Amino acid sequence: MTKQLSPYQDKIHKHILRDRFLSSFKQPGRFRAELEKVKLMQKEKGHE
């Protein structure tokens, strides 16, 4: 499905991709999950 985008649509599409990319860094859920992962790794090493 290679539909030609108008420059305007293409611009919007790029903004959507960029926003999605940025929001993936700002997701508190993902950040918390990473934090939990680190805590678990430290616990396994014997650090509380």
UniProtKB/Swiss-Prot annotation:
Pfam families assigned: DUF2740
Protein name: Uncharacterized 5.8 kDa protein
Organism: Escherichia phage HK022 (Bacteriophage HK022)
